[in-house]
Amino acid sequence: VPDGLRLRRAHPQDLDDIMWLEHVSFPADAWSASQMSGELYSPHGYYVVVETVDESAAPSVVGYAGLSSLAGNPVADVQTIAVAAEQRGKGLGRVLFTELLDEARRRGVREVFLEVRADNPVAQSMYTAFGFEHIATRPRYYQPDGVDAWVMRAELPVAADATPSSSPSPSTVGPIGQEALDERG
């Protein structure tokens, strides 16, 4: 993971940056700003961003991801994940996805579901590496281009300190660097 990046909890003030990345990442089927805003404000959601950290410039969001789970429910859904094109191939998708799964464990989630485009083998491969299995296909799910969605599922071991009513993680997750990855095991 390159130096100069930080992983942190997303805030509603990140909406414009997230929406810019949403539209360039998913031009045919991007979420609306009101949908994304609803996710950022939802008490059931957990969204994180990867941003640049440079003392000479304002931070810039280069990746984001979101999870949704109702309090006390052992099931969660990965809502979205995106990394800026110029940052792909550096492991940021894995960092974002790992944080979502860690939060799911902290919430006592036992099963995680997601949908991924059938024409996105890179994402499918990453999810498979995390133990997700293709369990169903939703024909023509992604509109307007009519691409099928793979529904994928994984079971999670629950973290020792997780309780279904555990509070969300602190707003600052921390820097991304080899040290942070080493700490995650």
Where in this protein do the model-derived segments appear?
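Short glycine/proline-centered loop/turn elements that form peptide/ligand docking sites
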Residues: 97, 120-123, 140-145
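Conserved catalytic-core motifs of GNAT/GCN5-like acyltransferases
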Residues: 113-115, 128, 133-150
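Short glycine-rich hinge loops at helix-strand junctions in the catalytic core
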Residues: 91, 108, 131
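Active-site acidic-Proline motif in GNAT/NAT acetyltransferases
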Residues: 83-86, 90, 118-120
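Well-formed, non-transmembrane alpha-helical positions, independent of function
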Residues: 17, 125-126
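Acyl-donor (CoA/ACP) binding surface of acyl/acetyltransferases
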Residues: 90, 138-141, 155-157
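Acetyl-CoA-dependent GNAT
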Residues: 2-5, 9-15, 19-86, 94-107, ...
